[in-house]
A protein has these predicted regions:
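Cytosolic/matrix-facing juxtamembrane and C-terminal tails of multi-pass cellular membrane proteins
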Residues: 7-22, 261-278, 298, 339-347
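A short macromolecule-binding patch
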Residues: 118-124, 292-298
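Alpha-helical transmembrane spans
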Residues: 14-87, 187-259
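A eukaryote-biased signal for long
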Residues: 1-2, 245-252, 256-258, 353, ...
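Cytosolic juxtamembrane N-terminal segments of multi-pass membrane proteins
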Residues: 1-29, 133, 154-201
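Short aromatic-glycine-enriched beta-strand elements
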Residues: 105-113, 278-287
Length: 367
């Protein structure tokens, strides 16, 4: 059986390092994105008192759109930390035999059938396939109100659940053996690969705001709209400043996509991660097929890095030049890393500012 990230079952769940990493990442997102949402929202409200010229109206629209989108970060944190507020994470994770119920046409929820007869329902996204594969799940709860939280092996994510009834009325899905073949033969990896293909267009995240900012500036020239000039100017400046990095990231994604497409198999390699520092790339020393090499993750994924930290194994989904695609078999995650065979220590080089807004907080990784 493949080794995956698993939470510790001998300490309270909140003291498990991987659970702490999940909570830390949620708080970081809420703090960073929430702070931006508050600032843009305050400016948007202030702009409501200005003359309703095309430029000012455009600025107000942009500010409130940013407020809405970035405000989703604190909302997600509030939803996904319910288990902590309810005290469910005060108890250890329990490894419980489990399977998955067949989903009927009228079912709005996924159903997990635990070995003790408990039924847990919720929106579990990709978790059921891993539960079906390993025939187990990690659970805290249910509490007196029937609330629980679950995790699956390999996932650096918690899912809220609620206890249901009548386990005998829910037929279980049949477990099917899935040999480990080409990465793209795996449905979960294929899902992640489709997302990675969108990364090839990462340059649009800078080019589009820069272009829209330029349009807003033009609209604000006549009649003169101070808010439009300021907001449009900031959008254009930030977009142009981030464009070189965005183009470089697009190139990394393009090479990673080629690596996955040309790969005939998963390649597991041993790796030791270096202690992480804020605003630095996640890096490690890996025993690559050609020898020891420094591996630096340009866009680190929380699931991938947590699995590496727990198991000491990095799963390579393909190689293209000095770029490797890295994932976790049967988990819908893919990222990429740069391989430097001539180095054995990471260079002290801060990551570009544009990447700091979406880099997870890895300070909770075990040392």
């Amino acid at each position: 059986m493949l080794q995956y990230l698993e939470p510790r079952t001998d300490v309270p769940a909140k003291d498990d390092w991987s659970t702490g990493l999940i909570l830390q990442d949620l708080r970081w997102g809420a703090t960073t994105l929430g702070g931006i949402a508050v600032v843009t929202g305050a400016f948007g409200v202030g702009c409501l008192f200005l003359a309703k010229t095309p430029g000012n109206v455009g600025a107000i629209s942009v500010l409130f759109l940013v407020t809405f989108l970035f405000g989703l970060g604190p909302l997600m944190c509030w939803v996904e930390t319910k288990a902590l507020r309810r005290g469910l994470l005060e108890q250890p994770w329990r490894r419980v035999p489990a399977t998955v119920a067949e989903k009927q046409d009228d079912d709005l929820h996924d159903l997990l059938l635990l070995g003790d007869g408990t039924v847990l329902k919720g929106w579990f996204e990709d978790l059921p396939d891993m539960v079906l594969e390993r025939q187990e799940v990690f659970v805290c709860g249910p509490d007196a109100s029937g609330r629980a939280v679950v995790r699956g092996a390999g996932f650096a994510k918690m899912e809220n659940a609620k206890a249901g009834k009548n386990a005998e009325t829910h037929p279980a899905r049949e477990r099917v053996e899935r040999p480990l073949g080409r990465p793209l033969d795996d449905a979960a990896t294929m899902k992640a690969y489709k997302g990675m293909r969108w990364g090839v267009r990462s340059w649009l995240w800078s080019a589009v705001p820069a272009g829209l900012g330029g349009v807003l500036v033009l609209l604000s020239l006549f009649p003169l709209a101070p808010a439009g000039l300021v907001v449009g100017g900031l959008m254009t400046a930030l977009g142009l400043l981030g464009l070189p990095t965005a183009i470089e990231i697009s190139r990394w994604y393009r090479d990673a996509v080629k690596a996955v497409e040309n790969s005939a198999q998963w390649t597991p390699v041993a790796i030791t991660l270096f202690p992480w520092k804020p605003n630095q790339n996640v890096a490690g020393l890996a025993q690559m097929p050609g020898g020891l090499a420094l591996v630096q993750f340009v866009i680190p994924d929380l699931n991938v890095v947590a699995n590496i930290a727990d198991t000491g194994v990095m799963w390579i989904a393909g190689t293209h030049g000095d770029v490797i695609a890295v994932g976790v078999p049967r988990v819908p995650v893919l990222t990429f890393a740069a391989v430097q065979p001539d180095r054995d220590t990471p260079k002290e080089d801060p990551i570009p500012w544009i990447q700091r807004f979406h880099q997870p907080d890895f300070s909770g990784l075990p040392r």
